[in-house]
A protein has these predicted regions:
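Loop-to-transmembrane alpha-helix entry segments
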Residues: 44, 80, 96-116, 125-131, ...
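Specific transmembrane alpha-helical segments of multi-pass solute transporters/efflux pumps
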Residues: 27-74, 79-80, 116, 197-215
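Transmembrane alpha-helical segments that form core, pore/gating elements
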Residues: 8-9, 20-23, 87-88, 124-179, ...
Length: 241
């Protein structure tokens, strides 16, 4: 319900900036004193990876919104879940890391569950589905590189801070290029922006980053696929869908 009066780029730009503002005092209080100790390892790698995960998150979000103009919700929901099998495949080819066989049954069950949950068996393949698959690639890369950066640098809030700022800036640029900027529309969506910005754009992504310090990318992707289940329950309970 957050894009009734403003476009998706502007919505993401504002909500991720809200997330940035919310995280900033937590960073100053909890992590600022640890920066020198952590970044002495390889500051260039830290900022490169933190910037990259922001770009991946922006591209995943943007392509998901664009694809909905050319496909339906069931297709988008199902093909987005493709990031689950993409994670171990990309990890293997990019970093030559072998994936334990026990992960694959769970990956297959995730795809099967997504197939049933989204009613994809009643869907028709559309031209926008390729965009959704590309979107899933960026979600997979986001999960993988979050795992890489947090395992080397114990600065989850700073990583989240950089990520939200990158997404906000790129989204605002997208809004300027592709949308009409409606300031009054932002105020009309105040509650939705605050909700999505504080809980999702801010805290949820930092919790993801923190959690991935102790878990490899493939199990992380499997766990994150529960988003579809929770979204279905929330849509039924909160929106009567």
């Amino acid at each position: 319900t957050g894009m009734e009066f403003i476009g998706p780029y502007l919505f993401n730009g504002v909500r991720f900036f809200v997330g940035f503002l919310v995280l900033l005092p937590f960073f100053l209080y909890f992590e600022k004193k640890n920066i020198k100790k952590e970044l002495v390892k390889d500051s260039n790698q830290f900022f490169k990876y933190s910037f990259l995960i922001g770009v991946f998150l922006f591209l995943g979000s943007a392509l998901q919104q664009i694809s909905l103009q050319y496909t339906d919700v069931a297709n988008a929901a199902f093909f987005t879940i493709f990031y689950v099998p993409m994670v171990p495949i990309i990890v293997f080819f990019l970093f030559k890391e072998k994936i334990h066989w026990s992960n694959w049954p769970s990956v297959i069950l995730c795809l099967l569950g997504g197939y049933l949950l989204t009613n994809f068996y009643d869907a028709t393949i559309r031209k926008g589905d390729a965009l959704v698959v590309l979107c899933a690639v960026f979600w997979a890369l986001h999960i993988i590189y979050v795992g890489k950066v947090i395992k080397n640098f114990n600065l989850p809030i700073l990583i989240g801070l950089i990520q939200t700022l990158v997404v906000s800036i790129l989204s605002i640029i997208g809004a300027i290029v592709f949308e009409e900027i409606k300031i009054d529309g932002i105020f009309k969506q105040t509650y939705q922006i605050l909700y999505a910005g504080i809980l999702s754009g801010g805290f949820a992504f930092v919790l993801q980053i923190y959690a991935q310090k102790n878990i490899t990318p493939t199990p992380a992707a499997i766990i994150f696929s529960l988003e579809g289940v929770i979204a279905t329950i929330a849509a039924w309970f909160l929106l009567n869908q």
